[in-house]
From Swiss-Prot:
Pfam families assigned: MinE (PF03776)
SUPFAM superfamilies documented for this protein: Cell division protein MinE topological specificity domain
Gene that this sequence comes from: minE
Leader peptide range in chain numbering: none
Family: Belongs to the MinE family.
Functional description taken from the UniProt entry: Prevents the cell division inhibition by proteins MinC and MinD at internal division sites while permitting inhibition at polar sites. This ensures cell division at the proper site by restricting the formation of a division septum at the midpoint of the long axis of the cell.
Name of the featured protein: Cell division topological specificity factor
Alphabetical GO biological process terms: cell division; regulation of division septum assembly
Organism: Alteromonas mediterranea (strain DSM 17117 / CIP 110805 / LMG 28347 / Deep ecotype)
Source superkingdom: Bacteria
Keywords: Cell cycle, Cell division
Cysteine pairings via disulfide bonds: none
Keyword flag Cell cycle: yes
């Protein structure tokens, strides 16, 4: 490896490599959707409605994720609450 090798610009990934990576992300996302229960989107909306009884939040401030392990399933709920000062 010479000095000139260090000065060369790094090559950008080819468009085929970028397309392949994007496709893999889409396929992984679709597979995850197939394994989640049918009731999860409805459950998320009901949780949002209950939270809105007490604070004003947007739909994108609530994240619901279901993780399946060998022995159990874990439902993770993340809510971004507004500042209490306002």
């Amino acid at each position: 490896m010479g000095i000139f090798d260090l000065l060369k610009k790094k090559q950008k990934p080819s468009t085929a490599a970028v397309a392949k990576e994007r496709l893999q992300i889409i396929v992984a996302h679709e597979r995850k959707k197939r394994t989640e229960p049918d009731y999860l989107p409805m459950m998320q909306q009901e949780i949002i409605q209950v939270i809105r009884k007490y604070v004003t939040i947007a739909d994108d401030q609530v994240s619901v994720q279901l993780d399946n392990n060998d022995e159990c399933s874990v439902l993770e709920l993340n809510v971004t609450l507004p500042d209490s000062n306002s």
